[in-house]
Amino acid sequence: MRKGKPARKLGRTAAHRRATLNNLSTQLILHKRIETTEAKAKETRKVIEKMITKARKGTVHAQRDIFKDIRDKKAIRILFEEVVAKVGARNGGYTRVIKLAPRLGDAAKMAIIEFVDYSEAISPAASQKSSKQDRAKRVQGSKKNVDAVAESAE
């Protein structure tokens, strides 16, 4: 009887696939949210969730074990100090994959992978709203300055 395939191959050799997933995991730890293809996001989710579960132990052995895959000391420190502190009480499900529109060049399925508990801190809607308010203040301020300059010229 034919069994299902255990993982996506992503069109790469085993070593290249492992390196790709480790790099995506490192970038996810550093940036808390990354945009990639849907298949890579789903495979990265498997890798990063196992790493976070190991990191929750907080032992030196866990650090060394994770350092085999993530060769960035800054990312390891962030994982053990910030990420584990945020998701320490959660039993799995540390990340979410949000599907996006297809990529323009090749119509590949795109997705965002992010940490669940960091979504409020990096939501783009909040930053856009504040930038619109800042722009409105600048525009109003410039109109006042133009009026003041016009009056002084008279």
Curated annotation (Swiss-Prot):
Which InterPro entries does this chain map to? Answer: Ribosomal_bL17, Ribosomal_bL17_CS, Ribosomal_bL17_sf
**The organism sits in which domain of life?**
Bacteria
Where does it sit, as one GO cellular component term? cytosolic large ribosomal subunit
Tell me the segments the record calls region Disordered. Answer: 125-154
Pfam families named in the record: Ribosomal_L17 (PF01196)
Claim: Nucleotide-binding is one of the keywords in the record: no
Tell me the Gene3D superfamilies matching this sequence: Ribosomal protein L17
A single Gene Ontology MF term assigned here is: structural constituent of ribosome
Keyword annotations of the record: Ribonucleoprotein, Ribosomal protein
Q: Disulfide bonds, which pairs?
A: none
What does the record list as GO biological process?
translation
Family, similarity comment: Belongs to the bacterial ribosomal protein bL17 family.
The protein's assembly and partners: Part of the 50S ribosomal subunit. Contacts protein L32.
What is the name of the protein in this document? Answer: Large ribosomal subunit protein bL17
Organism encoding this protein: Chlorobium chlorochromatii (strain CaD3)
